[in-house]
Regions:
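Short, flexible active-site recognition loops that position polar ligands and cofactors
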Residues: 152-160
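Generic detector of well-ordered alpha-helical packing
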Residues: 5-7, 60, 163
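Conserved helicase/translocase motor-coupling segment
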Residues: 1-31
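Acidic two-metal-ion nuclease catalytic site recognized across multiple nuclease folds
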Residues: 171-185
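Conserved active-site and cofactor/substrate-binding residues in soluble primary-metabolism enzymes
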Residues: 9, 39, 161
């Protein structure tokens, strides 16, 4: 699951995926404008339960939503302390994040890598994404209008850019090898 929480005038994007039949299949993709914070927290929790979500990647620019979601599922809310504890024990950030169900993602650091990863999944071997066009038209529109400017998404040119960001976050779960196998964590 990938979540781009709303702040300012942006929308709240949610994308849920699963690996089935050799493809990343979209189970849920929606964008909400000016949503109620509590309603979004409840919706995300319900989607996590309904789809038995293993990992939730959330834009780290909204720490209050991340902490609220972590509290709701019984995970340590102060994720900065968790990461610091792993560091003090000689483990890296990756070990701490691997043990988390709700994972904060620093878009400033990772946006280019996530865009490249997204392009690779969409383009390699004819694409590895299955999207129902009758259910997820906003996601399809966002993918069709996405513009890559030297590894950075041109948000002005991209329709539904918040659902696109949630899609990129959801794809962090998948790691492909040359043999078409998918490893996920």
């Amino acid at each position: 699951m990938g979540i781009d929480p709303a702040y300012g005038s942006s929308a709240f994007g949610i994308v849920v995926t699963e690996w089935a039949d050799g493809l990343v299949q979209i189970l849920y993709a929606e964008e909400y404008h000016r949503p109620d914070y509590s309603e979004m927290l409840s919706l995300v929790y319900d989607l996590m339960s309904k789809y038995q979500v293993d990992k939730v990647y959330v834009d780290g620019a909204n720490p209050s939503f991340i902490k609220s979601l972590k509290l709701q599922i019984g995970e340590e809310a102060d994720y900065d302390k968790v990461i610091a504890r792993y560091r003090s024990e000689g483990y890296g950030d990756d070990a701490a994040l691997k043990d988390m169900k709700v994972v904060p993602v620093n878009f400033n650091k990772e946006h280019k890598a996530m865009l490249g990863h997204c392009k690779m999944i969409l383009e390699n071997e004819g694409g590895r994404i299955a999207i129902n066009p009758d259910r997820f038209d906003k996601l399809i529109t966002s993918l069709r209008t996405a513009v890559d400017n030297d590894g950075t998404l041109d948000k002005e040119s991209t329709s539904y850019n918040d659902i696109f960001d949630a899609f990129r976050l959801a794809l962090k779960f998948y790691h492909f090898q040359e043999s078409s196998d998918c490893n996920s964590y």
